[in-house]
Regions:
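Short, small-residue-biased leader/transition segments that mark boundaries at the very start
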Residues: 1-3
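Active-site beta-strand/loop microenvironment that shapes enzyme catalytic pockets
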Residues: 7-51
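Broad gene-expression machinery/nucleic-acid interaction feature
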Residues: 26, 35, 80, 89, ...
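Short beta-strand segments
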Residues: 30-32, 95, 110, 124
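Mid-chain, well-packed structural core segment of small domains
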Residues: 56-102
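C-terminal binding/interaction regions
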Residues: 102-111, 116-128
Length: 128
C-alpha cells in the first residue's frame, strides 16, 4: 500500500482571516509546487481520506515502466500527474471573518511525494 499524506489547514486559514480582521470577501489559496495540491474534502471521517489516497495511488501507480520522467525518484512523475488531476488554487468566500465551507468540508494540502516536504501556501484576500 502506498499512502501519501494530507494536512488539514482550515483552522490556520480561519485564524489568518481573523488575525487580519478580514470581514467579507474572497480568499485565493495557492500552492507553489507541482507535486502537491490543494483539495476541499470531508474532515469528519478519516476513512474518507484513506479511501481518497488509495484511489489516487491506484489511478496513478508508482511504476517506473509507465513514465519517462523520473529525475527525482519513483514518485516524481506520479506526483506531477496527481497534482495535474487536482487543484493548485482554491478560491472561497469569506463572510463575517470566516471561510464559507460546508459542515464536513476542510481545506487540505494533498502531498504526492513519499518523503515529507516543505511546502509554501500563498493566501491572497480581496474584500473588506
Amino acid at each position: 500500500m502506498c499512502i501519501r499524506d494530507r494536512y488539514e489547514f482550515t483552522n490556520q486559514t480561519n485564524k489568518w482571516i481573523k488575525d487580519n480582521e478580514f470581514n467579507n470577501g474572497i480568499i485565493n489559496i495557492s500552492i507553489q509546487h507541482t507535486s502537491a495540491s490543494l483539495i476541499i474534502q470531508e474532515n469528519a471521517d478519516p476513512d474518507v481520506q484513506i479511501d481518497l489516497l488509495n484511489f489516487f495511488n491506484n489511478l496513478v501507480p508508482m511504476d517506473n515502466s509507465l513514465y519517462i520522467h523520473s529525475t527525482e525518484g519513483k514518485d516524481d512523475m506520479p506526483a506531477h500527474i496527481k497534482s495535474a488531476l487536482t487543484n493548485n488554487q482554491i478560491s472561497l468566500s469569506v463572510k463575517n471573518n470566516e471561510l464559507i465551507l460546508g459542515t464536513w468540508q476542510g481545506l487540505y494540502l494533498f502531498e504526492h511525494r513519499i518523503e515529507k516536504q516543505n511546502r509554501l501556501i500563498v493566501l491572497h484576500y480581496l474584500g473588506d
